[in-house]
C-alpha cells in the first residue's frame, strides 16, 4: 500500500519482527532557481510531507542560506503538509479572514503551532469584510496582529491583468512592507 505511506518511519518502529524494509521511491522533484526553491509533487502522489521535508533539508544545507531570512509558503490548515512546514519553522505567519470560518480555522492553526512550540504572528486579510471577533480573540490570546489588510479590488484586477499585485497596488505593497518589518524585528 505505497499510497498510504507518509514516509514517517512509524511502521518500522512498530514492527517488532523487523519484517519491514524501507524503500526509496520518487514522489516529486525539488527545483532550484535564483533565490527560490520549490517542491513539485508528482501527479497521483497524495503525500507531500516527505517532499516538504526534503526541501527543508536542502534549504538548511544550502550555504547561501546561512543567516538568511527564508520564507516558506505552507498549505492552509492543519494537514500533515502544514505540520511538516511548521515543524521546521522558526516563526509562523498565519493569514486569516475575519469571518466565523476564518476564526475557527485560525484557532486550529494556532493550536497546532502552540503544540509544536512555534511563535506565531497573524495577518488579517480583507479585514473590513467581517466583524472584530478575530482581532478580539487574537488580542485576548496575546498573539500579535502583524497587519490588517483591507479588501482591495485592485488586487483582483492586477491578477486578472497578469501583474504582480505586490508591485502594482501601493496599499498592498505598504502592508507587505510592514509585515516584512515585523519579521525582521522578530529576528
Q: What are these model-derived regions, one by one?
A:
Residues 112-187:
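C-terminal lobe/tail of nucleotide-utilizing enzymes
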Residues 1, 6, 10-26:
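Iron-sulfur cluster-binding cysteine motifs and their immediate structural context
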Residues 24-38:
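Conserved Radical SAM active-site core
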Residues 6, 43-50, 104, 167-174:
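Conserved active-site and cofactor/substrate-binding residues in soluble primary-metabolism enzymes
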Residues 38-47, 54-82:
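Switch II (G3) loop of P-loop NTPases
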Residues 72, 94, 122-124:
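Structural beta-sheet core signal
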Residues 66, 89-93, 114-121:
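Short, surface-exposed connector motifs at secondary-structure boundaries
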Residues 79-100, 106:
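Inter-motif core of Ras-like GTPase G domains
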Amino acid at each position: 500500500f505505497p499510497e498510504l505511506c507518509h514516509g514517517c518511519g512509524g511502521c518500522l518502529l512498530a514492527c517488532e519482527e523487523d519484517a519491514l524494509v524501507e524503500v526509496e521511491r520518487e514522489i516529486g522533484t525539488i527545483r532550484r532557481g535564483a533565490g527560490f526553491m520549490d517542491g513539485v509533487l508528482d501527479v497521483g502522489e497524495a503525500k507531500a510531507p516527505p517532499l516538504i521535508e526534503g526541501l527543508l533539508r536542502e534549504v538548511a544545507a544550502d550555504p547561501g542560506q546561512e543567516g538568511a531570512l527564508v520564507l516558506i509558503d505552507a498549505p492552509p490548515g492543519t494537514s500533515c503538509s502544514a505540520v511538516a512546514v511548521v515543524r521546521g519553522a522558526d516563526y509562523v505567519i498565519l493569514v486569516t479572514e475575519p469571518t466565523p470560518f476564518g476564526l475557527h480555522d485560525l484557532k486550529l492553526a494556532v493550536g497546532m503551532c502552540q503544540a509544536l512550540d512555534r511563535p506565531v504572528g497573524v495577518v488579517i486579510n480583507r479585514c473590513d469584510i467581517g466583524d472584530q471577533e478575530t482581532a478580539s480573540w487574537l488580542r485576548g490570546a496575546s498573539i500579535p496582529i502583524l497587519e490588517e489588510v483591507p479588501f482591495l479590488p485592485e488586487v483582483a484586477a492586477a491578477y486578472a491583468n497578469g501583474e504582480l499585485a505586490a508591485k502594482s497596488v501601493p496599499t498592498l505593497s505598504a502592508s507587505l512592507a510592514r509585515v516584512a518589518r515585523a519579521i525582521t524585528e522578530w529576528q
